[in-house]
A protein has these predicted regions:
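P-loop (Walker A) phosphate-binding loop of NTP-binding proteins
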Residues: 11, 23
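Conserved lysine of the Walker
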Residues: 16
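Hydrophobic positions on the alpha1 helix immediately C-terminal to the Walker A/P-loop
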Residues: 19
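Well-ordered beta-strand positions
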Residues: 29, 106, 156-157
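ATP-dependent small-molecule kinase phosphotransfer cores
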Residues: 29-86, 90-97, 135
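Small-molecule kinase domains that catalyze NTP-dependent phosphoryl transfer to phosphate-bearing small molecules
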Residues: 67, 124-172, 176
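Conserved phosphate-donor/acceptor-positioning beta-strand/loop module used by diverse small-molecule
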Residues: 88-89, 99-125
Length: 182
């Protein structure tokens, strides 16, 4: 049986990483495309600011093609002994095409209202999170520019992260995975 590769997508702050961290606690194997970029930034001795990571993401795609970020994780996914792999932060069809080389890919979109996302990102305080509405909108536009809007529209399923608990959101995602396995 080939691996089920569940790719989570959605705008920054929609709740993808929150779902992934809970699924990891439940024993799922998880990978983050953003972590791949952060690891590359560390390798290049770049400070992991939003501007630096965004610039690096674009440079990697320009230099190595639009699926470059997924290529950073492809071998690790192939080598995994888990039958279900969760991928956080897929942004383009090109990344999906790379990931299809590792197993049966399904795409789950996580959706949240802009105010919800902005407030979450401000509270999360990761080094690349925007602290102003202007930076938030710049980041959204950059993500849309690499194909995020199109990939969200192609999702096999989607879940809402507006006025729900983390557990409700994870439960919704898990039910979808189970349906995909059957």
């Amino acid at each position: 049986m080939s691996k089920l590769v569940v790719c989570l997508t959605g705008m920054p702050g929609a709740g993808k990483s929150t779902i992934v961290s809970k699924l990891k606690e439940e024993g799922y194997e998880t990978f983050s495309l953003g972590d791949g970029v952060r690891a590359e930034a560390k390798r290049q001795n770049l400070e992991p600011t939003g501007a630096n990571l965004g610039k690096l993401m674009l440079e990697l795609r320009e230099k190595n093609g639009p699926g470059a970020i997924a290529e950073l994780l492809k071998e690790s996914i192939k080598e995994s002994t888990h039958q279900i792999i969760i991928i956080d932060g897929v942004r383009s069809i090109h990344e999906i095409n790379v990931l299809k080389e590792t197993g049966n890919v399904k795409l789950l979109a996580v959706d949240a209202a802009p105010d919800t996302r902005f407030n979450f990102l401000r509270e999360r305080k990761r080094s690349d999170d925007p602290l102003t509405r202007e930076k938030f909108e710049e980041r959204d536009n950059r993500e849309i520019g690499v194909g995020l809007k199109e990939i969200i529209e192609l999702a096999d399923e989607s879940i809402e992260n507006n006025n729900v608990t983390i557990n409700q959101m994870v439960e919704s995602a898990t039910k979808i995975f189970q349906k995909w396995i059957e």
